[in-house]
Amino acid sequence: MSSTYETYPVEVAGVKRDLRLFTIKPGIRIAILNILGDTEFVQAVSQALAEKLANQPIDVIVTAEAKSIPLAHAVAVAMKLPYVVLRKSFKPYMGDALRSETLSITTGEPQTLFLDEKDRDLIRGKNVALVDDVISTGSTLQGMRLIMDHAGAKVTVEAAIFTEGDRA
C-alpha cells in the first residue's frame, strides 16, 4: 500500500530526489531533507562539498546532531580530517561540556547543543568548518558559532546542502 503526498523535486551533485512536503505550523510548509540511510546522496553531496572546501583553511569539521552526521563524516573522510558532533543531550561522560541553546524550526522548541569536553581540546585554536544538512533560520549555526567561540576555535567556513527561508 503506497501513500500519496506532495513532494518538491531537487537535484544535487547529479542525484535527484523528491522531498516530501510537511506542514510544520499553520501556513508554513517545508520540504524535508532526510539524508539518514541515503548513501548514494550522501556520497555524491559530500564529495561535491569536499571539493568546494578543498582550498579553505580547515582543521576540523563540526556538525550538530543528528541528521547531518553522515554528511559531516563523509566530508571529513574525503578531506582526511577529524570531525566533531555537537550533541543535543548531555551525557555524564561528556565532562565539562560547553552548551548553547538554539530554536529548532522543525519542532518549534528550544534545543541545547553540547560540546564534549574531550572535543574541546581537539578544536581549541583550530580552524573549523561548520557543516549542516539544511540551514533554515540559522539558529543552529548561531549556536554552533557560540560554542566554537567559547571553545577557542575559529570558524573559517560554513557549508550546507541547502538553505531555505529568508534568514538562511
Enumerate the predicted regions with their spans.
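Short glycine-rich phosphate-binding loop at a beta-alpha junction
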Residues: 58-65
